Protein backbone atom coordinates (compact mmCIF):
# COMPACT_ATOMS: atom_id res chain seq x y z
CA UNK A 1 0.00 0.00 0.00
CA UNK A 2 1.31 3.45 -0.87
CA UNK A 3 2.08 5.81 1.97
CA UNK A 4 0.26 9.11 2.22
CA UNK A 5 2.20 12.27 1.53
CA UNK A 6 1.69 15.86 2.59
CA UNK A 7 2.55 18.93 0.56
CA UNK A 8 3.81 21.56 3.03
CA UNK A 9 4.36 25.17 1.94
CA UNK A 10 5.89 27.95 4.04
CA UNK A 11 3.55 30.95 3.86
CA UNK A 12 5.12 33.35 6.37
CA UNK A 13 8.63 34.47 7.24
CA UNK A 14 10.60 32.91 10.08
CA UNK A 15 12.24 36.24 10.98
CA UNK A 16 11.49 37.20 14.58
CA UNK A 17 10.01 33.81 15.47
CA UNK A 18 10.98 31.59 18.35
CA UNK A 19 14.25 29.71 17.77
CA UNK A 20 12.49 26.37 18.28
CA UNK A 21 9.95 27.25 15.60
CA UNK A 22 12.73 28.25 13.19
CA UNK A 23 14.44 24.92 13.89
CA UNK A 24 11.16 23.11 13.23
CA UNK A 25 10.88 24.75 9.80
CA UNK A 26 14.44 23.63 9.05
CA UNK A 27 13.55 20.12 10.20
CA UNK A 28 10.64 20.11 7.76
CA UNK A 29 13.04 21.12 4.99
CA UNK A 30 11.58 24.60 4.46
CA UNK A 31 13.98 27.44 3.67
CA UNK A 32 11.98 30.44 2.43
CA UNK A 33 8.47 31.76 1.78
CA UNK A 34 6.57 29.76 -0.88
CA UNK A 35 9.05 26.87 -0.61
CA UNK A 36 7.16 23.58 -0.91
CA UNK A 37 8.23 20.10 0.17
CA UNK A 38 6.48 16.73 0.05
CA UNK A 39 6.76 14.70 3.25
CA UNK A 40 5.42 11.36 4.45
CA UNK A 41 2.35 11.58 6.66
CA UNK A 42 3.78 10.37 9.98
CA UNK A 43 2.93 11.37 13.55
CA UNK A 44 6.29 13.13 13.96
CA UNK A 45 5.79 15.23 10.82
CA UNK A 46 2.23 16.05 11.90
CA UNK A 47 3.56 17.20 15.28
CA UNK A 48 6.12 19.47 13.63
CA UNK A 49 3.42 20.95 11.39
CA UNK A 50 1.16 21.56 14.41
CA UNK A 51 3.99 23.44 16.10
CA UNK A 52 4.34 25.95 13.24
CA UNK A 53 0.77 25.81 11.87
CA UNK A 54 0.60 29.61 11.61
CA UNK A 55 3.55 29.73 9.15
CA UNK A 56 2.68 26.83 6.82
CA UNK A 57 -0.15 25.51 4.68
CA UNK A 58 -0.71 21.77 4.22
CA UNK A 59 -2.37 19.75 1.45
CA UNK A 60 -2.85 16.00 1.31
CA UNK A 61 -1.52 14.48 -1.90
Curated annotation (Swiss-Prot):
Annotated Pfam families: Ribosomal_L30
Highest taxon of source: Bacteria
PROSITE patterns: RIBOSOMAL_L30 (PS00634)
Any one cellular-component term (Gene Ontology): cytosolic large ribosomal subunit
InterPro entries: Ribo_uL30_ferredoxin-like_sf, Ribosomal_uL30_bac-type, Ribosomal_uL30_CS, Ribosomal_uL30_ferredoxin-like
Keywords: Ribonucleoprotein, Ribosomal protein
Entry GO MF terms: structural constituent of ribosome
GO biological process terms on file: translation
Binding partners and assembly: Part of the 50S ribosomal subunit.
Family: Belongs to the universal ribosomal protein uL30 family.
Name the record gives this protein: Large ribosomal subunit protein uL30
Amino acid sequence: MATKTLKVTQTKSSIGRLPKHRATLTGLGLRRINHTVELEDTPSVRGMINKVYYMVSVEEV
